[in-house]
Structures are given as C-alpha cells and as structure tokens.
Amino acid sequence: MEDGELDFSNQEVFSSSEMGELPPSNCSMDSFFDGLLMDTNAACTHTHTCNPTGPENTHTHTCFHVHTKILPDESDEKVSTDDTAESCGKKGEKRPLGNREAVRKYREKKKAKAASLEDEVARLRAVNQQLVKRLQNQATLEAEVSRLKCLLVDLRGRIDGEIGSFPYQKPMAANIPSFSHMMNPCNVQCDDEVYCPQNVFGVNSQEGASINDQGLSGCDFDQLQCMANQNLNGNGNGSFSNVNTSVSNKRKGGHRASRAV
C-alpha cells in the first residue's frame, strides 16, 4: 500500500454486489476508474489513521465506496415548479373560475326571482279580471234593480188607480152623471199641479183649465171634490158646488173615502 500503490487485499470492497464485476483482462485500469467515476459509485483519496496509532502507521491509500446520488422525480419537479411565479399565475387563473361560479349562481337566483315576479303579476291580473267582471255584474244588477223599482212603482200606481187613488181615476157609479169625476188626492206629491178634467169656472172641458187659473199644489189641500151641478143640463158643463181645502192637514199617505154629490 505504500508509495501510492493500490491495495486489493481488502476482499470485502471488491466482493460487494454494488461493485459489480471486475473489468476484463483486455480493459485497462484507467477505463475502469473512468467507468466508476461516471457511475453513481465514486472513488476518493483520503488520509486516515489505522490502529494502533502511531506516526509510522500513517499512510495514504485509495478506498472505494458508493456515492448515492438522489435524483428528483419528474412529479417532484412539477410540484416544485408549482411554487414558482408560474404556479402563482395558475392560482390566479383559478380565481376567475370562482367568480364565474358566483356570477352564475347570482344570475340563476335573479332569473328565479324574475320568474316568481312574473307569476305574481299573472296572478294579480287574473284577480283583477275577476274583480272587473264582478263590478260589471254589479252594475248590471243595479240597473236591473232600478228597472224593477220603476216597474214596481208603475204597478203600484195602476193598483192604486183600480182602488181610486190619485192620479188614476176610479170608475164612477151608475147613478152619477157621466160628466162628473171623482178624484182622491191622497197620493199627490208636493209641487204637483192638480187640474180638474171637467169644465171648471165656465171653461170648456176640452181646454182643461186649472183651479183658480193657476193650478193647485198637492200640499195646499186636504180633500178636493169635483162635483157636477145637478141643476145643469146634460150639455157637459159643470161647476164646483163644494171645494174643501185645508192647509193644516198635509198627510200624503193612506186612502181617503171619496164622495160624489
């Protein structure tokens, strides 16, 4: 081992499976060492002290040992590259995806709200149409009620005429002259003018003069009797023999007995 010679007496070094096979006889040692240096196994020269200690035992020799070289995997390289600025850029690109998702959800929510509002508008329109129809039906019913009221008033007047109520005339009895009329002013309203249908105060019956030439208000009398003058001939002329007016009694309801003389 001295003088820089190689000591191959250590069989453990060369018998190791990691050393591989010895070089063939036609291969030089230089090529062998180059192969070792190019391989993961490496050779180095260092100085160490062997037991027992002493200056005469200090020597230098070359030993062979395995250098383990850890190569990063491709996936590890990708992971490491993800931490660079490019990875930050990729993370920045992912943020718009989240924003898009939020925008999409907001739009869907807005569309759902708009759809619900449209449904509410349609429902309110239907209710409005129903209310309009009800109002139209109510107006029709009110018109029908008014028509029936008018018909009732007309029928009541006709019934009152049959029993002798004013303004309808009850047919006269057989013993009363034909030119005489019997009137009952019970249903005469205020401010209604009453006309005697026969000749009054020397006026022809065709002209239809009013009492006192001005007409008589229904509120100014209690009982008015138009009676024929029995002393007159049957020429159709007649006069009042008795006119009884009373302002104190102004009753408008109830039937009063009519008298004819």
Curated annotation (Swiss-Prot):
Residues 89-155 form the bZIP domain. Residues 117-131 are annotated as: Leucine-zipper. Residues 237-248 have a biased composition (Low complexity). InterPro entries: bZIP, bZIP_sf, C/EBP. One of its GO terms (molecular function) is DNA binding. Residues 1-22, 74-100, 237-261 are annotated as: Disordered. It holds the Pfam family bZIP_2. Keywords: DNA-binding, Nucleus, Transcription, Transcription regulation. This is Basic leucine zipper 19. The gene is BZIP19.
